[in-house]
């Protein structure tokens, strides 16, 4: 004889297998509806290159934009967003900063790929996928990718910033987009005779 609990589990498994509530098809629908709503509310740009896969462009202020990939799997929604390429220098300091930031993040964590490029990556169980949770997750990605961008550039690319600044000045080109790094580009002050 089948118990009520066993019957409920069987029905839930059957519903998921058919793509019902809590399954991948339902999650795809929820993600798509959430992105459509965000596009209407705030002009968020997104596309779905294939079923269950979404690419969202998050606008930034420090970093022009962050491309975020959302992929619905059998059991979870994964999120990945490129933040910055492999640092040119101070790799240990960059990695330490990333690990310390991970302690404060919601739903995602900084990760490094085999080339050393920095990403934000996370997974969410399909049962937790909904408009509010997706908004919270994308908000975290945007806040971190954009908010940490200048810090990561300072830590991992200070020499490149100085070279770029000097090159632009020597050619009379604008240095406006390097204004956030003036503390790195201004000449060292001479203390003068003692």
Language-model-detected regions and their locations in the chain:
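Well-ordered alpha/beta subsegment
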Residues: 115-139, 147-157
């Amino acid at each position: 004889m089948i118990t009520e609990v066993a019957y409920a589990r069987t029905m839930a498994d059957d519903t998921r297998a058919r793509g019902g509530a809590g399954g991948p098809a339902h999650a795809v629908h929820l993600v798509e509806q959430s992105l459509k709503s965000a596009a209407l509310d705030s002009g968020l740009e997104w596309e779905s290159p294939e079923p269950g896969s979404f690419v969202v462009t998050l606008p930034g202020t420090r970093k022009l934009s962050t491309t975020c990939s959302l992929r619905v799997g059998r059991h979870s929604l994964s999120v990945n967003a490129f933040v910055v390429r492999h640092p040119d220098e101070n790799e240990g300091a960059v990695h330490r900063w990333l690990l310390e930031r991970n302690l404060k993040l919601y739903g995602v964590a900084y990760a490094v790929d085999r080339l050393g490029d920095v990403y934000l990556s996370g997974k969410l169980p399909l049962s937790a996928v909904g408009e509010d949770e997706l908004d919270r997750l994308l908000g975290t990605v945007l806040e971190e990718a954009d908010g940490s961008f200048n810090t990561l550039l300072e830590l991992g690319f200070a020499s490149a910033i100085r070279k770029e600044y000097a090159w632009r000045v020597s050619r009379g080109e604008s240095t406006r987009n390097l204004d956030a790094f003036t503390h790195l580009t201004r000449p060292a002050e001479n203390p003068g005779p003692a």
